[in-house]
A protein has these predicted regions:
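Beta-rich carbohydrate-recognition and catalytic domains
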Residues: 1-50, 58-111, 115-169, 177-228, ...
Length: 263
């Protein structure tokens, strides 16, 4: 996000399966959008979690900062979202975190995307079914609204997978823009469980935040390497009218980089 003349970026650090998974979340800042200096780090041990997923950083109307953290409940397929708040990102303290999206015995909740417009907070969060552990990789994006960004009212599924398409196994919204009367969302999709961690990016549109419809029959973007993963795309509007994109992309060796483009 852009604040006080700088770009602040929240991201997670991840090791391969069996070697730690998402072991930390970092917040860094930059003056050019490409070269970042770390501001703070939160490690998975501090959050009593098996893994940390993509975080989300917001600023409240009173100027304070919030970092929403997706946490894997140890020994389960369950996910929850906690939040920490501080006057500045450098002051985030994991000891002050509290749960805002607990999920339940049937649903894991993670990867919130949050947009505040006026007095209303909009959120799209990824939900995973827990009834059958073998199917827990399936995902839909549900929408919720709030007046404070802490207590949320759920309104149901906004975007799900499409049978027979490249995103049939699930859809995870990663970025949302309000453009006049149209809502444009970017999302991760996959067709099979084997494509977990190698999702590709699609685009969906709608006129209401509660209902988004995928556009086209093919992904918008993917990596040319290995499993083809290009995911967690986010879009930042700059003061000069250009946009900066950030996304995770699979490299030739199978590792994932965080990359940026200026458009």
């Amino acid at each position: 996000m852009l604040a006080d003349g700088e770009i602040f970026l929240a991201y997670r650090l991840r090791r391969p399966l069996g070697h730690g998974r998402g072991y930390a979340v970092a917040v860094a800042r930059s003056t050019d959008g490409e070269h970042f200096d770390p501001v703070t780090m939160i490690y998975k041990e501090e959050m009593a979690t098996d893994s940390l997923e993509r975080p989300y950083l917001v600023r409240t109307p009173d100027g304070s900062w919030r970092l929403y953290l997706s946490c894997a409940t140890p020994g389960t397929k369950h996910w929850r979202v906690e939040v920490v708040e501080a006057a500045h990102p450098s002051e985030f303290d994991s000891r002050r975190s509290h749960v805002v999206l607990p999920g339940d015995s049937k649903t894991g909740v993670k990867d919130p995307v949050i947009v505040r417009r006026g007095d209303e907070w909009h959120m799209w969060a990824t939900c995973h079914p827990l009834d059958d552990p073998a199917e827990a990789d399936q995902m839909v994006t549900e929408y919720a609204c709030s007046t404070d960004g802490i207590t949320w009212t759920w309104a149901g599924v906004a975007l799900g997978g499409r049978p027979g398409h490249w995103d049939s196994r699930g859809a995870r919204v990663t970025s949302v823009c309000f453009d006049g009367g149209t809502i444009v969302a970017y999302y991760d999709g996959r067709a099979t469980a084997a494509e977990n961690y190698e999702e590709r990016t699609g685009v969906a549109i709608g006129t209401e935040p509660t209902v988004l419809a995928a556009v086209g029959t093919e992904p918008l973007a993917w990596s040319p390497y290995h499993g083809g993963g290009l995911r967690y795309l986010d879009l930042l509007s700059l003061p000069d009218g250009r946009k900066r994109l950030y996304y995770e992309m699979t490299r030739p060796d199978g590792a994932h980089d965080l990359r940026t483009e200026l458009q």
